[in-house]
């Protein structure tokens, strides 16, 4: 007899439960009505990384964010005549900022404050405070859409579409 080396597959029959290698629990950080997002939010549903799991109605909060952006825009527009007279060297960068300001996009970073006089003037008019209020609200607005951190399968769903979701509530 001749012996030959070959690969023999090893099969191990096993019974038991699988435990996910990566598992996260979903909690709401905002309150609102759970809206449809294209896929049913049910156990067994597959999601790709970055795909929307849950959309919470943000219409009211969005209106507040837009109002804050408008207030920031108006505050900057109100100081433009003073900038033209008292700070002609920085007027153009603020004019460019206003021209590029779009209420339907993320608020752009404020121009760099180059001198102490400019810094005191801009800060004294509440521009910096308004800017950070808007940025804070934009960050919170993003929490109305909960996205899958990685590809996987939903194993638990504790809310249904159309129900009220409360801040801190476990979703799945």
Q: What do these predicted regions represent?
A:
Residues 28:
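Conserved phosphate/oxyanion-binding catalytic-loop motifs
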Residues 16:
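Active-site-adjacent helical/loop segments in soluble small-molecule enzymes
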Residues 6-9, 23:
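Terminal hydrophobic membrane-targeting helix
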Residues 1-6, 19, 31, 35-36, ...:
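Periplasmic scaffold and linker elements that assemble and bridge Gram-negative envelope complexes
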